[in-house]
């Protein structure tokens, strides 16, 4: 079978239609700079050759080529499913790749970059090369922060944390990261409705000397919002109450009277049947607290903490505005399977002796309603010795893991 695949892999043109060409190679050569590797640019190619192993063997194409023209045969169906159809060269996709490569270079500050292609056609196969000429990159001459809101202005002007510095090479990826940083800081300081899509960058590259001036500011559509809508974007919201719904399905039961409920210090807990976790365990693992400002960082930490608790399968956290500057937080929890039993049987062979081993395990992921994990494992083996003897071996282990959720 190996030799069949090797032969068919060599005959890569078997399934290439007449008048068409197999895209055999697609290489990228970057000139004028060592800061951009050709491998980084391959993601922008709109058409890539068939997958190669060891740099030359198109194994999946070879598997595809083993299929006969009769697609009703089982072998042909599976060969086409497992294999990889030949990549037929497309001049249209090559043109798109050229534009994408040029755009990628411009996004890295190479505004005058150019991309040319060359082809070598032989034996119905195309070897394509993209020649990328980088030219001199543009650098940031001046960086301006232009926000009327003082909170936003202070965050964006923080030169210690800002990703944009004068003199650095222009890079749109860094600009987008700076947008995310500024928006995240706003949301970590109570601005629930603020979003990175509200921020834009304006670039002026007419200064000459391969330099560009950058200004960070609000999108134009913000000015078309009403006064109330604009104030809402920059308003600091506080958490009024935190509601824990300890059963994902029960939280959707229309008849609230069928649920168990407890209230404590601004926290509300609802559940049906057995309580998933103790109240203190949930509070300890949820840094979102009544009376505090909304903080996106604490939201992320709450997801991380709660998802690590074994009794919890799924976490969803939503916020509900209840006044002009207050939010209610709803933490919806879905319980996982708390008890599990496992059994494993295997044959053994050691130094000519045959045997059999049986292993069993039990786990409880919420022993004291505080996300404690109790495990009990055992293993027994029986071995027939060549000298006529017998060997029996057994071992057991027990463990109890206390989560940070444990509250006393």
Question: What residues fall within each predicted segment?
Answer:
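C-terminal motif of bacterial Sec signal peptides marking the signal peptidase cleavage site
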Residues: 6-9
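Interaction-mediating elements
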Residues: 11-308
């Amino acid at each position: 079978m190996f030799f069949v695949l090797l032969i068919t892999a060599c005959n890569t043109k078997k399934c290439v239609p007449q008048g068409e060409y197999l895209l055999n190679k697609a290489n990228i050569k970057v000139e004028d700079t060592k800061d951009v590797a050709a491998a980084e640019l391959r993601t922008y190619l709109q058409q890539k050759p068939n997958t190669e192993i060891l740099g030359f063997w198109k194994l999946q194409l070879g598997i595809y080529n083993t299929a006969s023209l009769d697609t009703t045969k089982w072998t042909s169906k599976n060969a086409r499913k497992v294999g990889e159809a030949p990549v037929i060269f497309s001049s249209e996709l090559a043109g798109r790749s050229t534009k994408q490569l040029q755009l990628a270079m411009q996004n890295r500050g190479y505004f005058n970059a150019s991309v040319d292609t060359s082809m070598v056609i032989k034996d119905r196969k195309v070897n394509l090369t993209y020649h990328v000429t980088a030219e001199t990159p543009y650098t940031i001459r001046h960086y301006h922060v232009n926000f009327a809101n003082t909170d936003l202005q202070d965050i964006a002007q923080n030169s210690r944390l800002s990703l944009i510095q004068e003199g650095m090479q222009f890079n749109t990826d860094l600009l987008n990261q700076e947008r995310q940083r500024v928006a995240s800081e706003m949301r970590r300081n109570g601005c629930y409705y603020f979003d990175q899509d509200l921020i834009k960058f304006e670039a002026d590259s007419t200064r000459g000397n391969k330099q560009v001036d950058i200004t960070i500011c609000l999108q134009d559509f913000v000015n078309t919002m009403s006064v109330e809508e604009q104030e809402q974007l920059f308003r600091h919201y506080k958490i009024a109450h935190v509601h824990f719904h300890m059963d994902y399905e029960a939280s959707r039961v229309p008849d609230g009277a069928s649920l168990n409920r407890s209230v404590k210090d601004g926290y509300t807990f609802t559940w049906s049947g057995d309580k998933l976790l103790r109240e203190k365990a949930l509070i300890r693992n949820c840094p979102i607290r009544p009376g505090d400002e909304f903080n996106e960082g604490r939201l992320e930490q709450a997801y991380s903490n709660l998802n690590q608790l074994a009794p919890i399968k799924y976490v969803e956290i939503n916020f509900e505005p209840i006044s002009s500057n207050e939010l209610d937080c709803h933490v919806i929890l879905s319980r996982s399977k708390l008890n599990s039993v496992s059994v494993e049987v295997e044959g053994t062979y050691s130094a000519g002796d045959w045997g059999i081993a049986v292993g069993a395990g039990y786990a409880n992921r919420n022993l004291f309603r505080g996300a404690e994990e109790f495990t009990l494992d055992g293993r027994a083996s029986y071995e027939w010795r060549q000298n006529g003897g017998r060997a029996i071996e057994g071992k057991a282990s027990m463990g109890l893991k206390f989560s940070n959720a444990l509250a006393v």
